[in-house]
Amino acid sequence: MTRMYVGIDHGTSGIKVAAYDGEGDPEFLGKAPRRKVAERGLLRSLPDEARRAVEEAECICLNYGMGDALTEFTPLEEAEDLGVGYGLRDTSGAGREFGAGRRMVEELSELGVEAYLAPGIHRDLPRLDGAFRVFSHVASGEKLGTARLALELSSSKDIVVCDTSSNTVSVVVKDGEVIGGIDACLGAPGVLQGPLDLEAIRRIDAGELSANGAFSTGGIVKIVNCAGEDPESAVEEFIQRCGKEEKEWLARLVAWEVAGLGVVYDCDEAWIGGTLSGDDEFMGVLERVLSKAFNKVAGLPPESASMGLALIAADIASGARSVLGVRISRRP
């Protein structure tokens, strides 16, 4: 029987599942809307092939929430023992919550498959560069998946990996280890979510909206009329309905973030993942600008996070002690 390693990306636009059999490249198997998972559960919401992969997996690596309570890849049952939330002490963070993640975690626990939670990238990670410790949080755990896939494909161990979709998050990899990055609420916006500007701060202080509400609508949607604010459809609307000009605006902002990190940390290559990596107009602008700062600019599949998490699941099953400089917590 073929061994199957599964990655599950609990993202803004849905829960994505990929699998890796130890040969070739990981394969994206399907996606389930978060609202549907919250109502029906993960397995009943996935396409058949993805459901079977989850049920038959030798090892699963997944992300859930911000991941700030974890500093290692942690067995699911150990993370749950930490309490309420992710890690599982705290699910609170940025973005809209539907309850799908908690339902997913509970279901996987009952399934009995070996499953590991990916930690977030935050100031308590031992390998984090000191400059990034000024920020409490740099990225949630699925970005480790995106970085793992990029390293698998890259000819360099010094790269910037950017995931741009509902939001934009960039991660710096030096000597094959994640040392920092820029979170969605700090740097370039995505389609739906983005940093808090002066207008947002004033509205928050005036009690007109919450900080999370400001972040959740801080992306390029606030200045364009071609995409709405539904987290499960905003990105596809942007790709299908917005023109070259709007895509160029966003691409310039993403390029600003990625190029800055690349110059400061002397990185050779830039790898772009997330749903927008599949849009030719957006990527054309990004590649043209970033080629001035990097020896190579390449796109990753839109499902790169789940695919990379599947590779990490295989690393864990093979007995690796760490991935990307992040330790793996082993059962006694």
Swiss-Prot record:
NCBIfam families associated with the record: methan_mark_12 (TIGR03281)
HAMAP family to which the protein is assigned, alphabetical: UPF0285
This protein's name: UPF0285 protein MK0078
Stated family: Belongs to the UPF0285 family.
Pfam families: DUF1464
